Amino acid sequence: MLKKEESLMNIAKMIDHTLLKPNATKEEIKKVCEEAREYGFASVCINPCFVDLAYEMLKDTDVKVCTVVGFPLGANTIETKVVEAVEAVKKGATEIDMVLNISMLKSGEYDYVKKEIGEVVKAVKSHGDIVVKVILETCYLSDEEKIKACEISKEAGADFVKTSTGFGPGGATVEDVKLMRKVVGENFGVKASGGIRSYEDAKAMIEAGANRIGASAGVKIVEEWKKQGLG
C-alpha cells in the first residue's frame, strides 16, 4: 500500500481510471483501457458489462480491472450483490467497488450492512486475491454514520473504504477523507472519488489520507503532475 510520499511520486499508480457514465460506448471503454496501458494506472474502473473487454485488453499489463457492484444506489439485495461480484471476478475483475446499503446504514441496521459486505468479501476472495472497496456515499451520511460505516467495512473484511459513487449530490471532500483515514488507521485503504478533476485536487486528497484516487480525469491529472516536474 503506497504511503503518502510514495503516492505523490507515483501518482498514476494510485489512480483508478474511471468511466462509469451510463452512455459510455464500447469505443470509449477501449480508449480508457489504452490510456491505462500507456500511463500505467492502478486500474480501470468500468461498468460490469465491459469487464471481459477490459480484461482482454489489459491482461498482459499490471493494470487491474475494477468494476462496481450495487451501483450506484446500493439498494440491491445481498444475494444480488454477491452474484454480481462473483460474475465480475469470473470475467476477470480483480477489484470490486461495492456500494453499501445506504438505507440500511441510516436505519441503524448495522448487522445487515456488516453481513452484506462480509458476504461479498467471502464470495470474491474464495476466487483469489480480490480487492474489495466499500463505497459509503458520504454526501448522504452524518459524521457518526461515516465513522460507523468505516468501522463496519473494516470488521467485515473489506480492503478499502471509498467516499462516493460520483452519481450522488456530492463527491469527495478533504474533511471526509481525513475522517475516514482516522477511523480505519494506516494499514487500510481509503479511496477518494467524485469531483477530482486536477492534480491539485488529487494532491489534496492524498495529503488528507487517500491512497487511491477514482477519477475520469486521470490523464489530465498525470499530465499536470508531469508539468510540475514531478514525473
Curated annotation (Swiss-Prot):
The protein's enzyme class = lyase
Q: Which UniProt keywords apply?
A: Cytoplasm, Lyase, Schiff base
Entry's Gene Ontology BP terms: 2-deoxyribose 1-phosphate catabolic process; carbohydrate catabolic process; deoxyribonucleotide catabolic process
Enzyme Commission numbers on file? 4.1.2.4
Catalytic activity entry: 2-deoxy-D-ribose 5-phosphate = D-glyceraldehyde 3-phosphate + acetaldehyde
Task: Tell me one Pfam family matched here.
Answer: DeoC
Q: In Gene Ontology terms, what is one molecular function of this protein?
A: deoxyribose-phosphate aldolase activity
What residues sit in the active site?
A: 97 (proton donor/acceptor), 162 (schiff-base intermediate with acetaldehyde), 191 (proton donor/acceptor)
Q: Does the keyword Magnesium apply?
A: no
Q: In which pathway does it act?
A: Carbohydrate degradation; 2-deoxy-D-ribose 1-phosphate degradation; D-glyceraldehyde 3-phosphate and acetaldehyde from 2-deoxy-alpha-D-ribose 1-phosphate: step 2/2
Subcellular localization is given as: Cytoplasm
Question: A cellular component term (GO) from this record?
Answer: cytoplasm
What Gene3D superfamilies does this protein's entry cite?
Answer: Aldolase class I
Homology family? Belongs to the DeoC/FbaB aldolase family. DeoC type 1 subfamily.
Known function? Catalyzes a reversible aldol reaction between acetaldehyde and D-glyceraldehyde 3-phosphate to generate 2-deoxy-D-ribose 5-phosphate.
From the Swiss-Prot or TrEMBL record, give the protein name: Deoxyribose-phosphate aldolase
Natural source organism: Caldanaerobacter subterraneus subsp. tengcongensis (strain DSM 15242 / JCM 11007 / NBRC 100824 / MB4)
User: Gene encoding it?
Assistant: deoC
